């Protein structure tokens, strides 16, 4: 948890990437990859050249023993003559509600992700998780706190969100988001749905919010195997479900959308369409 807390400091320091000129990229990526024909999992960061000094300064100030090395040759997850598949992470519920964060885990959630990569064959299989970070242009904290104040006054959470008119398609109101199973009723009887909503919104607004694209790409000799690799990696995100808040779901891409996905993946471009508003603690997790 100490390391994860330090990563949260790193992301906070990288918020200044927003001070970029209009014609320059204002985002960076962190990637976990297992290239085809290589049995070593790579942790990779891609930063615009004009922000390289910022990145190195942030990393070395927080992790003084870290070694930052320029990698001029990019990795390649794609199997020659094979099939490649990809998906974007989306939020299953309203983004005002947070996913489960690292401070509530009794184990390192990263180990579960690493385990899925370790099962991929050295030759004939490759995969990557690419997270693109970009400063949010919208003041989510202010908007979410406005909704929070209404809920604290007794306005039902779904009504408070509707009244805010905030976020358009991003703010899809979940139906029965607070419905509980019979097994959970005893545990929750002391908490009303509104008190749970208040706690979750307070957690969401507890640290700055950025935008993130989360892409998962996989490649193998057959589509079935590529789909299996993709499914296994997607499943590793299940541990991040907050039963009273939010969870990740994944949109599989096909045809033209898949072509655009791999273009954006290869060039590490940011997609506004698949932007997820996540606070720094969620991103760290």
PLM regions and their residue ranges:
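Extended, folded cores of ATP/NTP-driven motor/assembly subunits in large transport
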Residues: 1-285
């Amino acid at each position: 948890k100490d390391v994860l807390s330090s990563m949260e400091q790193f992301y906070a320091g990288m918020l200044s990437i927003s001070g970029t000129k209009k014609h320059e990229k204002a985002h960076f990526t962190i990637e976990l990859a297992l290239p085809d024909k290589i049995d070593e999992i790579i942790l990779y960061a891609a930063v615009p050249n004009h922000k390289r000094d910022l990145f190195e300064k942030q990393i070395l100030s927080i992790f003084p023993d870290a070694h930052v090395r320029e990698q001029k040759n990019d990795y390649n997850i794609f199997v020659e003559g094979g099939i490649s598949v990809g998906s974007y992470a989306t939020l299953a519920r309203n983004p005002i509600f947070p996913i489960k964060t690292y401070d509530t885990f009794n184990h390192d959630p990263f180990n579960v992700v690493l385990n899925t990569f370790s099962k991929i064959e050295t030759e004939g299989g490759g995969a990557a998780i690419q997270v693109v970070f970009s400063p949010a242009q919208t003041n989510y904290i202010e908007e979410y706190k406005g909704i929070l104040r209404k809920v604290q006054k007794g306005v039902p959470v779904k009504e408070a969100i509707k009244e805010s008119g905030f976020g358009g398609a991003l703010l899809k109101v979940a139906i029965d988001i607070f419905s509980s199973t019979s097994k959970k009723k005893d545990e929750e009887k002391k908490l009303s749905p509104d008190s749970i909503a208040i706690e979750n919104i307070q957690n969401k607004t507890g640290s700055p919010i950025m935008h993130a694209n989360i892409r998962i790409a996989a490649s193998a000799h057959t589509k079935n195997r590529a789909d299996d690799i993709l499914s296994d990696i997607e499943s590793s995100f299940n541990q991040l479900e907050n039963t009273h808040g939010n969870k990740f779901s994944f949109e599989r891409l096909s045809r033209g959308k898949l072509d655009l996905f791999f273009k954006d993946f290869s060039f590490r471009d940011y997609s506004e369409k698949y932007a997820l508003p996540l606070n720094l603690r969620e991103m760290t997790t």
